[in-house]
Amino acid sequence: MTVRPDPRSPSTRDRTLRGGSIGPGGYRRLTTGAGEPWIVRTLDETGPISGHISGPIRQERAVGDGEPLLAIAHLSDTHVMDCQSPARVEFLDRFLHPDVALPSATGDDGRTYRPQEPLTTQVLDAMARSIAAARTGPFTGRPLDLSIVTGDLTDSAQANELAWLAAILDGGRVHPDSGDPGRFEGVGCLAWHDPAYWHPDGGPGDIARDRHGFPLAPGLLDAARRPFTAAGLGLPWLAVYGNHDGLVQG
C-alpha cells in the first residue's frame, strides 16, 4: 500500500531553521532554510552514519510502499526551566571563564547559563502547537498515534518545572513564574545587575550586549513569566527519564 503525506502538515521536509549571518560580536538571528530529504534507516546492514551513532544501520531513500504501523512525534531535551529558582547556579560560570558570560561558538563547555532560558515554556508550547498542526506523519500520512519525550523534560528536577511541562503537553493554563509576582527575579533582572548576564530591558552595559551584539528587548522578562493557555499536543505522550529530571541542573 502506498500512503501519501498530508500536504498541509508542516515539517522539516518543507523548511528548517538555520543560523543567519554572524554579527561582529558573534550574535546571530535565526532564519529559514531549505527542507531536509527523507531518509530511511534500517537494521539489516552494517555501516557508519553521520552523527554520534554507528553500527548496523543503513540509509536509503524511502519509496513510499508498505503499510505504516505507527506514527510518533518525537520531542527531546525540552529542559523546561524555572530560571528564578534559588537553586540555579549560574554564578559558577565565573569560575570557569571569569570574563566571558556565554557558551563558546563551538559548543557546550559546561556552562550553567544561557540567555534564552526564560523562554523555555513558550518554546515548548510552540513545539506542541506545531505537532498538533501536523496531525500526520510527513511521509506516510498516517495520523499521529502518540508523542515520546526522550529525557530531560525539566532542567533542574523541580516539581513546578514538571507541572509546567505537563500543562503544556496536555493543554491548559500555564503560569511560568515562581518569584515575586511584581517583578522578574532571575539573573537578567535590572535590580541585581551583573554584567555577566544579558539584560534585555537595558540598564548598564553587559557582556552579551557590549561584546557579543545581543539586542535590547524591553519587556521580554515580564512577558516570559506571563500566564498563557497551552493548546496541548492533542495526543497521548510518554516520557523517558533524563539526568536533569533527577539532579539539580543535571
Language model features: what each stretch is:
Residues 1-148, 154-241, 246-250:
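Acidic, histidine-bearing metal-coordination/catalytic regions of metal-dependent phosphoesterases
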